[in-house]
């Protein structure tokens, strides 16, 4: 790789890192491309060399988070389906909490009120969360942990409803609701009930 290519990769990564920082500080809707390039110390035109618009760079951030979670799952690839799901839920909630409660509230409000680009932002997150969860469940079917007739799409909807409900309750309670404790309780009390009927007997 040439020095020019290395510099291009560094600039692209800097734009990604800065965008993620700024979203955590001020939210997506108030963030402008000018804010990003000013913080990154590059010309505004530089942004468009790597990304077409603000939504595209956020999509890339989501992809990177997806990859980070997948790497953590790969580290416990020999663990059972319950342990993998609990790790995924833990990563899910901690990532949401890293954006601070006022930012998550703004995001939820934007989706409810259908603010500019809010539908696309909500869809992006839902698609990536759904894909990650499906991959975990499909792998469990292939490994004979879950039965071949496991209703994966239905289970994904049930589980994601629980996860999204947790960070919604966190916002509604002004932070008094503890999402991490809720995840732990969900894993210990509800999860086996939800997927228990589809687990192979030898794996229960």
Task: For each feature predicted by the language model, list its residue ranges.
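Alpha-helical DNA-contacting segments of helix-turn-helix folds
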Residues: 51, 57-65
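Short, basic, alpha-helical segments at the C-terminal edge of helix-turn-helix-like DNA-binding modules
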Residues: 33, 62-70
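Short hydrophobic/aromatic patch on the recognition helix
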Residues: 41-51
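Amphipathic alpha-helical segments used for helix-helix packing
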Residues: 96-117, 168-172
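Hydrophobic/aromatic-rich alpha-helical bundle segments in the mid-to-C-terminal region
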Residues: 141-188, 201-204
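Hydrophobic alpha-helical connector segments
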Residues: 60, 74-99, 152, 156-159, ...
């Amino acid at each position: 790789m040439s020095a020019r290519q290395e510099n291009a990769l560094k600039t692209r990564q800097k734009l990604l890192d800065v965008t993620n920082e700024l979203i955590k500080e001020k939210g997506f809707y108030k963030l402008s491309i000018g804010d990003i390039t000013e913080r990154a110390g590059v010309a505004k035109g530089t942004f468009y060399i790597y990304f077409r618009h603000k939504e595209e760079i956020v999509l890339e951030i989501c992809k990177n988070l997806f990859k980070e979670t997948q790497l953590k799952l790969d580290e416990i690839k020999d663990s059972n389906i319950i342990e993998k799901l609990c790790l995924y839920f833990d990563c899910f909630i901690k990532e949401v909490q890293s954006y601070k409660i006022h930012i998550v509230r703004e995001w939820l409000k934007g989706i409810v009120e259908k603010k500019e680009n809010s539908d696309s932002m909500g869809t992006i997150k839902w698609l990536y969360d759904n894909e990650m969860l499906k991959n975990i469940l499909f792998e469990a079917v292939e490994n004979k942990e879950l039965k071949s007739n496991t209703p994966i799409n239905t289970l994904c909807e049930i589980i994601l409803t629980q996860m999204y409900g947790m960070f919604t309750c966190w916002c509604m309670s002004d932070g008094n609701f503890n999402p991490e404790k809720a995840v732990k309780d969900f894993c210990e009390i509800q999860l086996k009930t939800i997927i228990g009927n589809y687990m192979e007997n030898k794996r229960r």
